[in-house]
């Protein structure tokens, strides 16, 4: 049909089949159709597409933009996005961050220990040197007016960074995972706990990861890389 986007992702096609399959099965059960075509047909699941994220070069450009900016409003938005980028915290979690309540010290280093508002899952993420600078600039409280205005501002920042995708609050979280953490050799096991991800197969395992274990596996590499 004219104006309809072409579905190119096998994962997206699989999801359409998954939803449609349940209706076909119900129609077959009720006798509305003579046979269930899905009994002889299986679609491939496909691989999930990569999450868009900023590269290390783009992150460093963003840091320079903040250092050179004298606009108070722009600085507040930039700091909030950078705070998300270097903690992996979702918008709602970053907005409700309380330094006195959420900071713990392990092996002489500070970490943010909290629970995700969306899922209730615990997360522990390091306070990197650059994160501390951001907190100091904002009196240890990250404040922002609204998510809508924040995303509007980020569209302009995305253009300045030559992003091939819309820059949103979610991109900061993806950037933490792909560039800040995995890019410095953090294991997926530790990253999952740091971000408070939910996984049916491993939730119980990660929920029991002691903070000492997380600290030992993060090591000094992230702290040295992002000053």
What residue spans do the PLM features occupy?
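N-terminal core-binding DNA-recognition domain of tyrosine site-specific recombinases/integrases
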Residues: 1-25, 30, 70-73, 143-149, ...
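Basic, Lys/Arg- and aromatic-enriched nucleic-acid-binding interface segment
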Residues: 6-10, 14-16, 29, 33-91
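Short, charged phosphate-coordinating catalytic segments
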Residues: 25-36, 84-108, 189
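Conserved tyrosine-mediated DNA breakage-rejoining catalytic core shared by Y-recombinases
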Residues: 52, 58, 87, 96-134
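Short, basic (Lys/Arg/His-rich) helix/loop patches that form interaction surfaces
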Residues: 68-71, 137-144, 152-193
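C-terminal catalytic core of tyrosine-transesterase DNA break-rejoin enzymes
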Residues: 82, 86, 173-201, 205, ...
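A short, basic/aromatic helix-end/turn motif that makes direct DNA contacts
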Residues: 96-102, 170, 192-198, 207-209
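DNA/chromatin major-groove-contacting recognition/catalytic segments
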Residues: 123-129, 133, 208-227
């Amino acid at each position: 049909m004219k104006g309809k986007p072409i579905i190119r992702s096998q994962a997206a096609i699989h999801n359409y089949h998954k939803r449609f399959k349940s209706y076909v099965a119900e129609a077959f059960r009720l006798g509305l159709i003579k046979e269930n075509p899905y009994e002889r047909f299986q679609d491939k699941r496909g691989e999930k597409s990569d999450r868009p994220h900023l590269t290390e070069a783009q992150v460093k450009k963003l840091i320079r933009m903040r250092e050179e900016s004298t606009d108070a409003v722009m600085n507040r938005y930039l700091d909030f996005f950078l705070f998300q980028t270097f903690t992996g915290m979702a918008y709602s979690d970053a907005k409700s961050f309380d330094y006195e309540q959420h900071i713990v010290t392990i092996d002489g280093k500070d970490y943010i220990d909290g629970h995700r508002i969306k899922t209730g899952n615990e997360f522990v993420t390091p306070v990197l040197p650059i994160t501390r600078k951001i907190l100091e600039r904002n009196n240890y409280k990250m404040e922002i007016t609204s998510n809508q205005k924040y995303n509007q501002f980020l569209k302009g920042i995305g253009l300045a960074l030559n992003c091939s995708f819309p820059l949103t609050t979610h991109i900061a979280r993806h950037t933490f995972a792909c560039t800040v953490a995995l890019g410095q050799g953090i294991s997926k096991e530790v990253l999952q706990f740091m971000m408070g991800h939910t996984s049916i197969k491993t939730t119980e395992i990660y929920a029991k990861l002691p903070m000492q274990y997380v600290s030992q596996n993060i090591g000094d590499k992230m702290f040295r890389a992002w000053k």
